[in-house]
Each structure stands twice: as structure tokens, then as C-alpha cells.
A protein has these predicted regions:
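A conserved mid-protein helix/loop that constitutes part of the nucleotide-sugar donor-binding site
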Residues: 10, 214, 218-237, 243, ...
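Carbohydrate-associated surface elements
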Residues: 173, 196
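Short alpha-helical donor nucleotide-sugar binding micro-motif in glycosyltransferases
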Residues: 277-279, 285-290
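Acidic donor-binding loop of glycosyltransferase active sites
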Residues: 288-303, 320
């Protein structure tokens, strides 16, 4: 994975724990350490044994010498494939060069310790790491493609798919996208496996919340792709219509200051709360008091899109009604009018109308 332990990536944490429950030894090789003030307790324990590496060190240099001596052709071929595949995208190229030294070191460590298989989360730099490890060693790799990683930059995607033992994606929408990009041969390597939910933690609540005020919950990184600004505008429309509404925005991120200004400008300081990050247990507690969970996702100007927000699955597991954008793989989870309500992205009026319907 790119970073660990990341609060928002509960789907990665849940998968690690579930695989370990099956008796499989899991070793973690994150590309970067995530520095956060709130961490899931289970992730904190895993981080204690994760293999974090600096970008450059003497052991890393020794690993490069090891592969250069053993098979200069494989080493040069792996580096050339990375440079050729990422050329033309400044961000991807710089990121790929940045991780190359430590990935070579990780490859040597995995080989020395008898790692049988490498699985990577996200089809961008983590999958590139798996691709490199596969080129340097005989260890097979696979990866999971989620959402934004397939939309912003697909460089090397088809090379990664071709080299992988298999590829998991979290929606039929993503599967179709990969087949369109890489052609029919990719179809045989693809499996759709939706992200899971801890139903021991997220389970039907014992009692409904009080009828008033109408309580709206939104969980996710405060980022343009999550569309929280459109929910704030929908809350303004509901308040103008005389509806006693309270909205709780869970998460943190680059849009926090802008959202706080929007809330203040709309006069919603007593109706919309930005409460910051919460653990999985904290989100479960908030769901117990919510009338609805909203996922107002939007495509960004750069083309970034969500896959299927895990917060939607968690809410539905708790029996909480959901309203979400009709986007990407979300309609595979939310059957409009049956298991939830779907609205067009970037449409606060439609969002407010759906919330009034509830």
C-alpha cells in the first residue's frame, strides 16, 4: 500500500485482519508511513511490525548492488520498464523514481524471507512496486484497483495487469474500465470482489434516533471528490424550507478550511459540525444516532472518482438509510428507490429533495 496506517482505508485494514484470521502470515511493506493523530487500534498494532524503509540507506544501496551483480539484465529491464511506463507524467514519474530504491530493497527482503506472494492495494504506485518486485524476483504479484487510482493516471496499467497473477477490482464498473483500456486478454485476470464490512461492529441498531432534529451523517476525507460542499448547500436549502436539520461531517483533509468558511457564510454554524477524524468504532456510534448517511461523491476536474464508498456499506449494515451520487460503482450497491436513493452528482437541489423525501 502507499501509506500505512491510514484512517480512511478501513477496507485495507479489514482485509489484512481477515486474511490473518485464515491462518496466513501477512508481512506489511508500506511505501510510506502515515503520520496521524487518530489511528484505528488494530492498525496501530500492525504498524508496530510493518517494514517501513527510508528512501535511501546503506542497506538499500547493498540491495541494488546485489541485484546488479546477480542479474544486471533483469535489474536494468525493471528500471527501464518503470521509466518508459511513467514518462510523460511529472507526478507519476517522480513518484516512481522516488520509490524505486526502497522497492528494490523490499524485493530482496521478501526473497530472503521466503515470501510466496505480493498483493498491492491501488493500481498506481503500489501496483508499480509489485510489478518491479515481479521483474526482479520470481515472486508473483497481484493488486486491487479501487477508484481514484484508475481515473487520474493509467500509465503502466496494462503492463501491470499483464504481469500480475490476478487483478481484483471492487466493482463491475472498474472491471469494464480495465477491459476497455487493456483489451480482452485482461478479462481472464480480473475478479470483482466488493470491499467487506465488519458486521460485528457495524450491525443493525437496537433503536431508531429521535424524530427531530433530522440527523445527517457524512463520512470521508474532506476532499473535492467526496462532494461535501454540495451537502452543505443542500442543508442550507433544507433549513430555508423550515426543516430542523443537523449535519455531521466526519473526516479531515485539504478542503476543511473551505468547508468551514462555506458553513459560516451560509449561517449554518449551529446546524453543520465538522468533527474531524473518527475511528471505526467512533463512526459506528455516530451511525446509531443518524437518520441518513450521505455520500455526495463527484468527479473532480482532474478526473478523480470514487469507487464504492465503504461508509455506504457500513451505514447499510447498520440499517441506516443512504443517499448517494449516481456515479462509478455506487449503483451496484445502492438500488435507487429500493436500498437507498441516488441523485445526480453536483446537484444540491436534487440532494435536498431526496433528503426531504426521507
Amino acid at each position: 500500500m502507499s501509506r500505512f496506517p491510514r484512517l480512511s482505508e478501513t477496507f485495507v485494514l479489514g482485509e489484512i485482519l481477515a486474511v490473518e484470521e485464515q491462518g496466513v502470515d501477512v508481512e506489511l511493506f508500506p511505501l510510506l508511513r502515515e503520520r496521524a493523530d487518530v489511528v484505528h487500534p488494530e492498525a496501530a498494532a500492525l504498524a508496530e511490525r510493518a517494514r517501513f524503509q527510508p528512501f535511501v540507506s546503506v542497506p538499500i544501496l547493498r540491495s541494488h548492488v546485489h541485484f546488479l551483480r546477480r542479474s544486471p539484465r533483469r535489474y536494468a529491464g525493471a528500471l527501464w520498464a518503470l521509466l518508459r511506463g511513467t514518462w510523460g507524467s511529472a507526478n507519476y514519474f517522480a513518484g516512481a523514481l522516488g520509490i524505486f530504491p526502497k522497492v528494490v530493497h523490499q524485493a530482496r527482503a521478501m526473497e530472503a524471507e521466503g515470501v510466496d506472494h505480493v498483493h498491492c492495494h491501488f493500481s498506481n504506485h503500489p501496483a508499480a512496486a509489485g510489478f518491479l518486485i515481479g521483474r526482479l524476483t520470481d515472486i508473483p504479484y497481484s493488486f486491487t484497483a479501487h477508484g481514484f487510482d484508475l481515473h487520474v493516471d493509467r500509465r503502466m496499467l496494462c503492463e501491470k495487469v499483464a504481469g500480475a497473477a490476478f487483478v481484483i477490482t471492487i466493482s463491475e464498473y472498474n472491471r469494464r474500465l480495465i477491459v476497455e483500456e487493456c483489451g480482452g486478454p485482461a478479462r481472464a485476470k480480473l475478479a470483482v470482489i466488493h470491499c467487506g464490512v465488519d458486521t460485528g461492529l457495524f450491525r443493525p441498531r437496537e433503536a431508531s434516533p429521535p424524530e427531530r432534529p433530522f440527523s445527517i451523517l457524512c463520512v470521508g476525507t474532506l476532499h473535492e471528490v467526496k462532494g461535501q460542499g454540495y451537502l452543505v448547500e443542500a442543508c442550507r436549502l433544507l433549513a430555508e424550507a423550515g426543516i430542523d436539520v443537523r449535519c455531521t461531517l466526519v473526516g479531515d483533509g485539504p478542503d476543511r478550511a473551505a468547508l468551514a468558511r462555506q458553513v459560516a457564510s451560509a449561517g449554518l454554524g449551529d446546524r453543520v459540525d465538522l468533527v474531524g477524524r473518527r475511528t471505526r468504532a467512533g463512526v459506528a456510534e455516530l451511525l446509531a444516532r443518524a437518520h441518513v448517511l450521505v455520500a455526495p461523491s463527484v468527479p473532480t476536474k482532474e478526473g478523480k472518482r470514487e469507487g464504492i464508498p465503504v461508509a455506504l456499506m457500513e451505514a447499510m449494515a447498520c440499517g441506516v438509510p443512504v443517499v448517494a451520487s449516481d456515479l462509478s460503482g455506487i449503483p451496484e450497491l445502492v438500488d435507487d428507490g429500493a436500498t437507498g436513493l441516488l441523485v445526480p452528482p453536483r446537484d444540491p437541489e436534487a440532494l435536498a429533495s431526496a433528503l426531504r423525501r426521507l
